[in-house]
Amino acid sequence: MHMKSLSKKPFYSSIPIIVSFPLGVFLINEILVFLFGIRSIHENRIDNIIHGLGGVSVCLSSGGVLWHLMSRGIVKLQDENVFRFLVFGFLCFVVICWEILEYILYHPSEFFTYADTISDMVCGLIGGLFAMLVIRKIIPNEKFS
């Protein structure tokens, strides 16, 4: 099965989506931490919302980058499911790296427990899967390929 919609540029392959969306989520997180403090962010579970949005942004960005690589002939994929698995694999990689970074930067903090790490990872993965589902099922004629 060949990739069907490679010739049509999907919305997630635009530079503002690829670059600005992940940076925007990161900046929103930092602004909220600055304004309300890390204790308030964790007690009100706002960090889970931010991790979910981060999962959406990483999923869209990695899909956009992979689409550009395919359209230039750098990467050749014959199946759109392989495309989806690559995007999901990159999402998993980023989620794990982000939690390692949080551990390194904030280790002595009382808020970064094992349960918090797992909930952050789950929220990031759910956000990414939600983005894939929305693009595949809800937005007509828009695929991750």
List the predicted regions and their residue ranges.
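Bulky hydrophobic segments
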Residues: M1-I118, V122-S145
